[in-house]
Protein backbone atom coordinates (compact mmCIF):
# COMPACT_ATOMS: atom_id res chain seq x y z
CA UNK A 1 0.00 0.00 0.00
CA UNK A 2 1.57 3.28 -1.08
CA UNK A 3 0.48 6.89 -0.78
CA UNK A 4 1.46 10.15 0.91
CA UNK A 5 1.42 10.59 4.66
CA UNK A 6 -2.08 11.21 6.04
CA UNK A 7 -3.67 9.76 2.88
CA UNK A 8 -5.67 7.32 5.01
CA UNK A 9 -3.74 4.13 4.23
CA UNK A 10 -3.95 2.68 7.74
CA UNK A 11 -7.61 3.64 8.09
CA UNK A 12 -8.30 1.96 4.75
CA UNK A 13 -6.82 -1.32 6.00
CA UNK A 14 -8.39 -1.03 9.44
CA UNK A 15 -11.85 -0.72 7.88
CA UNK A 16 -11.27 -3.18 5.04
CA UNK A 17 -13.38 -5.92 6.58
CA UNK A 18 -10.40 -8.29 6.62
CA UNK A 19 -9.76 -10.43 9.69
CA UNK A 20 -6.39 -9.89 11.36
CA UNK A 21 -6.01 -12.92 13.67
CA UNK A 22 -2.66 -12.00 15.22
CA UNK A 23 -3.62 -8.60 16.55
CA UNK A 24 -5.78 -7.28 19.33
CA UNK A 25 -8.61 -4.81 18.92
CA UNK A 26 -6.41 -1.78 19.54
CA UNK A 27 -3.46 -2.68 17.33
CA UNK A 28 -4.21 -4.59 14.15
CA UNK A 29 -0.75 -4.35 12.65
CA UNK A 30 2.89 -4.95 13.55
CA UNK A 31 5.29 -2.05 13.30
CA UNK A 32 8.64 -2.38 11.62
CA UNK A 33 11.71 -2.40 13.82
CA UNK A 34 15.00 -0.55 13.66
CA UNK A 35 16.09 3.06 13.55
CA UNK A 36 14.00 3.85 10.48
CA UNK A 37 10.66 2.13 10.04
CA UNK A 38 9.90 1.13 6.45
CA UNK A 39 6.34 -0.09 6.87
CA UNK A 40 3.66 -1.59 9.06
CA UNK A 41 2.81 -5.26 8.54
CA UNK A 42 -0.85 -6.28 8.47
CA UNK A 43 -1.37 -10.06 8.69
CA UNK A 44 -4.86 -11.16 7.64
CA UNK A 45 -6.34 -14.57 6.88
CA UNK A 46 -6.19 -13.81 3.16
CA UNK A 47 -3.00 -11.80 2.70
CA UNK A 48 -0.06 -9.94 4.20
CA UNK A 49 -0.35 -6.23 3.53
CA UNK A 50 2.56 -3.80 3.78
CA UNK A 51 1.58 -0.25 4.70
CA UNK A 52 4.63 1.67 3.46
CA UNK A 53 5.86 4.92 4.97
CA UNK A 54 4.23 7.91 3.31
CA UNK A 55 7.56 9.63 2.81
CA UNK A 56 8.51 6.96 0.25
CA UNK A 57 5.82 8.31 -2.04
CA UNK A 58 6.65 12.00 -1.72
CA UNK A 59 10.21 12.54 -0.46
CA UNK A 60 13.10 12.34 -2.92
CA UNK A 61 15.60 12.27 -0.03
CA UNK A 62 14.34 8.80 0.94
CA UNK A 63 14.83 7.32 -2.54
CA UNK A 64 17.79 5.11 -1.57
CA UNK A 65 15.96 3.75 1.46
CA UNK A 66 12.96 3.04 -0.78
CA UNK A 67 15.18 1.11 -3.20
CA UNK A 68 16.73 -0.86 -0.32
CA UNK A 69 13.24 -1.78 0.85
CA UNK A 70 12.32 -3.05 -2.62
CA UNK A 71 15.57 -5.00 -2.88
CA UNK A 72 14.76 -6.67 0.43
CA UNK A 73 11.35 -7.73 -0.87
CA UNK A 74 12.86 -9.16 -4.03
CA UNK A 75 15.51 -11.05 -2.06
CA UNK A 76 13.10 -12.57 0.44
CA UNK A 77 10.35 -13.40 -2.08
CA UNK A 78 12.17 -14.26 -5.27
CA UNK A 79 9.24 -15.76 -7.17
CA UNK A 80 6.62 -13.13 -6.42
CA UNK A 81 7.87 -10.18 -4.34
CA UNK A 82 4.39 -8.66 -4.33
CA UNK A 83 0.99 -9.64 -5.73
CA UNK A 84 -0.34 -6.14 -6.28
CA UNK A 85 -0.21 -2.50 -5.20
CA UNK A 86 -2.91 -0.33 -3.68
CA UNK A 87 -2.45 3.40 -4.18
CA UNK A 88 -4.24 5.55 -1.60
CA UNK A 89 -5.26 8.97 -2.91
CA UNK A 90 -6.96 11.32 -0.47
CA UNK A 91 -10.07 13.07 -1.73
CA UNK A 92 -9.14 15.91 0.64
CA UNK A 93 -6.03 16.52 -1.47
CA UNK A 94 -8.05 16.45 -4.68
CA UNK A 95 -10.51 19.00 -3.29
CA UNK A 96 -7.91 21.48 -2.03
CA UNK A 97 -4.87 21.19 -4.33
CA UNK A 98 -4.40 23.28 -7.46
CA UNK A 99 -3.93 21.72 -10.88
CA UNK A 100 -0.12 22.02 -10.82
CA UNK A 101 0.11 20.32 -7.43
CA UNK A 102 -2.18 17.53 -8.58
CA UNK A 103 -0.09 16.99 -11.70
CA UNK A 104 3.09 16.72 -9.60
CA UNK A 105 1.31 14.38 -7.21
CA UNK A 106 0.20 12.06 -10.01
CA UNK A 107 3.65 12.13 -11.61
CA UNK A 108 5.35 11.10 -8.36
CA UNK A 109 2.94 8.21 -7.81
CA UNK A 110 3.50 7.06 -11.38
CA UNK A 111 7.27 7.14 -10.77
CA UNK A 112 6.90 5.01 -7.64
CA UNK A 113 4.85 2.43 -9.55
CA UNK A 114 7.42 2.35 -12.35
CA UNK A 115 10.19 1.87 -9.78
CA UNK A 116 8.30 -1.01 -8.22
CA UNK A 117 7.96 -2.75 -11.57
CA UNK A 118 11.55 -2.12 -12.63
CA UNK A 119 13.16 -2.93 -9.28
CA UNK A 120 11.10 -6.04 -8.63
CA UNK A 121 11.16 -7.19 -12.24
CA UNK A 122 7.48 -8.02 -12.61
CA UNK A 123 4.09 -6.70 -13.63
CA UNK A 124 1.26 -6.58 -11.10
CA UNK A 125 -2.26 -5.17 -10.75
CA UNK A 126 -2.59 -1.62 -9.42
CA UNK A 127 -5.66 -0.69 -7.38
CA UNK A 128 -6.32 3.03 -6.95
CA UNK A 129 -8.40 3.74 -3.86
CA UNK A 130 -9.83 7.19 -3.18
CA UNK A 131 -9.82 7.67 0.59
CA UNK A 132 -11.59 10.15 2.87
CA UNK A 133 -14.60 10.28 0.56
CA UNK A 134 -16.72 11.04 3.62
CA UNK A 135 -15.39 14.60 3.32
CA UNK A 136 -17.39 15.09 0.11
CA UNK A 137 -20.56 17.09 0.88
CA UNK A 138 -23.58 14.79 0.87
CA UNK A 139 -21.62 11.55 1.30
CA UNK A 140 -23.09 10.72 4.71
CA UNK A 141 -26.66 11.47 3.65
CA UNK A 142 -26.30 9.45 0.45
CA UNK A 143 -24.86 6.26 1.93
CA UNK A 144 -26.18 6.23 5.52
CA UNK A 145 -28.94 3.70 4.78
CA UNK A 146 -26.77 1.02 3.15
CA UNK A 147 -27.25 -2.53 4.37
CA UNK A 148 -24.32 -4.62 5.62
CA UNK A 149 -24.15 -6.53 2.34
CA UNK A 150 -24.18 -3.29 0.34
CA UNK A 151 -21.37 -1.86 2.46
CA UNK A 152 -19.21 -4.89 1.65
CA UNK A 153 -19.43 -4.25 -2.09
CA UNK A 154 -16.66 -2.42 -3.92
CA UNK A 155 -17.77 0.76 -5.63
CA UNK A 156 -15.49 1.21 -8.58
CA UNK A 157 -14.43 -0.21 -11.93
CA UNK A 158 -11.84 -2.50 -13.47
CA UNK A 159 -9.83 -1.14 -16.37
CA UNK A 160 -8.00 -2.99 -19.14
CA UNK A 161 -10.62 -5.66 -19.64
CA UNK A 162 -9.47 -8.46 -21.89
CA UNK A 163 -10.13 -7.59 -25.51
CA UNK A 164 -10.81 -3.90 -24.83
CA UNK A 165 -10.12 -1.74 -27.89
CA UNK A 166 -9.94 1.62 -26.10
CA UNK A 167 -7.17 3.32 -24.13
CA UNK A 168 -7.06 3.25 -20.30
CA UNK A 169 -7.99 6.95 -20.26
CA UNK A 170 -11.05 6.31 -22.41
CA UNK A 171 -12.03 3.32 -20.30
CA UNK A 172 -11.71 5.40 -17.14
CA UNK A 173 -13.91 8.13 -18.59
CA UNK A 174 -16.54 5.61 -19.66
CA UNK A 175 -16.57 3.86 -16.28
CA UNK A 176 -16.71 7.18 -14.43
CA UNK A 177 -19.72 8.16 -16.52
CA UNK A 178 -21.41 4.85 -15.70
CA UNK A 179 -20.74 5.28 -11.98
CA UNK A 180 -22.11 8.80 -12.09
CA UNK A 181 -25.27 7.56 -13.79
CA UNK A 182 -25.72 4.92 -11.10
CA UNK A 183 -25.51 7.65 -8.46
CA UNK A 184 -28.15 9.66 -10.29
CA UNK A 185 -30.43 6.63 -10.51
CA UNK A 186 -30.00 5.96 -6.78
CA UNK A 187 -30.64 9.62 -6.00
CA UNK A 188 -34.24 9.45 -7.19
CA UNK A 189 -35.03 6.56 -4.85
CA UNK A 190 -33.21 8.07 -1.89
CA UNK A 191 -34.87 11.47 -2.32
CA UNK A 192 -38.30 9.86 -2.15
CA UNK A 193 -37.40 8.30 1.21
CA UNK A 194 -35.78 11.35 2.83
CA UNK A 195 -38.07 13.74 4.72
CA UNK A 196 -35.54 16.17 6.21
CA UNK A 197 -35.20 19.10 3.79
CA UNK A 198 -31.61 19.93 4.77
CA UNK A 199 -30.44 16.34 4.38
CA UNK A 200 -32.43 16.03 1.18
CA UNK A 201 -30.54 19.00 -0.27
CA UNK A 202 -27.17 17.48 0.63
CA UNK A 203 -28.27 14.13 -0.79
CA UNK A 204 -29.41 15.72 -4.04
CA UNK A 205 -26.09 17.48 -4.60
CA UNK A 206 -23.81 14.51 -3.92
CA UNK A 207 -23.73 12.97 -7.45
CA UNK A 208 -22.74 16.36 -8.88
CA UNK A 209 -19.71 16.39 -6.56
CA UNK A 210 -18.63 13.17 -8.26
Language-model-derived ranges and their functions:
Residues 1-210:
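Basic, amphipathic N-terminal segments
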Amino acid sequence: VIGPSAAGKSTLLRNSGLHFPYADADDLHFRGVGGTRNCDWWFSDQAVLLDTAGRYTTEEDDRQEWFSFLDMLRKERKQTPINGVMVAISVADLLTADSDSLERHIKIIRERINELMERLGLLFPVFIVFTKTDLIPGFEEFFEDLSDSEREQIWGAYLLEEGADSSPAEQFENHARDLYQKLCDLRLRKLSMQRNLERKGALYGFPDQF
